[in-house]
Amino acid sequence: MRGDAQNIDLQLDKVEKILPQISNICDLVLTGGEPSMAPNVMHELLQLFQKYRVNVNNVYIVTNGKDITPEFIMACLEWYLYCDDNELSAIALSQDEFHDEIEQTNIEKLKALSFFNDTDKTVDFRKSYVLNIGRAKKLNNQRKQQPIRVQPTAYINESSNELNIVDCNLAITVNGDILSDADYEYTETDNIKIGDTNDKLEELFTDIVDDIY
């Protein structure tokens, strides 16, 4: 999510409510906010995934690189070891003109992880799309603006009778709200919320499934 610091950690009790409904996540993204500020939450979240046997193929962790502690490194490693595939797993640095320069010592710490990708989040926004929200509304028209609202695709697997949700970046906020995309700012949450972790996923996506079948 975009916007100013919110000074709040992920509420694990909110996440736990929805995990029994999930059997597999193809690509799990841990972002924020800033995940390096709460390695204990990362560890406890992993314990919940283990408790409910939620399979994860890949994990993608995005950090600003300002505070790389041994606890954060260990939490990243634990998540990497938990994943089944790891073909796309990575820890990436937010490196662009809008972020402060990252200390080289912190970069070296991250390089100790084999799945560290030091170029994946290096973006020249003069050549790439920006989101027309928040401070980006004030950028000049030389920058390309990207539409970001995406309609998810959902279907029922006939053999397993399970709900499959694809073609979207389904996101859970720190407060337990479920969004169809995480590329928004905090102030936009109410406008893009499709439910919360108290809801049943099948009920949230019933209309989409009915439209397809």
Each language-model region and where it sits:
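Short, contiguous strand/loop micro-motifs
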Residues: 5, 32-33
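General structural signal for secondary-structure boundaries
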Residues: 7-12, 69-71, 83-85, 105, ...
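Accessory C-terminal segments flanking Radical SAM cores
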Residues: 138-213
